A protein has these predicted regions:
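Membrane-embedded alpha-helical hairpins and interfacial helices in multi-pass inner-membrane proteins
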Residues: 57, 132-206
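Aromatic-anchored segments of alpha-helical transmembrane domains
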Residues: 36-44, 91-99, 137-146
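Short helix-perturbing small/polar motifs within transmembrane alpha-helices
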Residues: 41, 109-146, 197
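Hydrophobic alpha-helical transmembrane segments
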Residues: 29-33, 62-66, 83-90, 103-107, ...
Length: 215
């Protein structure tokens, strides 16, 4: 048995799971659902630290990225095939939209979830650098909301106040959104996603080493 086959089995999936030869099984869907729920929990915990404050909310994408890397990468390891990352992105997007978040974030979650699936698939979901890149790409999905504060501040504020956000909150956000804030947000999200992803890869490596082989 080759190393890739052992790696796949140690991750709890059939040895041929990453070859795209079959669709998602019931077990795969259950695993995807569990990890999607965990991802949402960690994302909300990260968001809860900053999102309620109109000055600190700009650092929410970085905080969410810092907490979700291990979950995202473990999902790829457990179900190394096309589909789970798309499902995660779609479910997260649907929940964001249903809970009153700006529609651009929901749309970005769906689109970047699909992009992440393609990127990880280039390495058959076993190439660590590509899996890490997939997570970093998806971690930028909150920017689909915040970007509109610069692109269309009036429309952005009108949409969110129409869905329950206080006008005072939006006014403070607008005053805080200086020219340097947008690139700083992107950089912080990328750096935090990189750190979180590396932690996730290290945790996976330790799991593989306990199983008697190296990742």
């Amino acid at each position: 048995m080759g190393k890739d086959e052992i790696l796949s089995e140690s991750a709890g999936t059939p040895s041929g799971a990453a070859d795209g030869g079959r669709g998602l099984s019931a077990r795969d869907l259950i695993t995807t659902g569990v990890f999607t729920a965990l991802f949402l929990v960690f994302m909300m915990v990260g968001g809860a630290l900053f999102a309620p404050n109109p000055v600190l909310t700009f650092w929410m994408p970085a905080a969410a990225a810092l907490l979700t890397g291990p979950v995202y990468l473990l999902l790829i390891a457990r179900v190394p095939r096309h589909g789970p990352l798309v499902i995660l992105g779609a479910v997260v997007g649907a929940i964001l939209f249903a809970t009153g978040m700006y529609w651009g974030w929901a749309a970005a979650s769906v689109v970047l979830g699909a992009v992440a699936d393609v990127v990880a698939g280039l390495g058959r979901f076993r190439a660590k650098p590509l899996n890490l890149l997939a997570f970093i790409i998806y971690s930028l999905s909150p920017m689909g909301s915040y970007l509109m504060l610069w692109a269309d501040p009036g429309g952005y504020a009108a949409y969110l106040t129409g869905r329950g956000t206080e006008q005072a909150y939006m006014d403070t956000m607008a005053r805080t959104a200086t020219a340097w804030m947008l690139p700083a947000m992107v950089l912080a999200a990328v750096v935090c996603a990189l750190i979180s992803g590396l932690v996730g890869l290290r945790l996976l490596r330790r799991q593989f080493e306990r199983a008697g082989m190296t990742a």
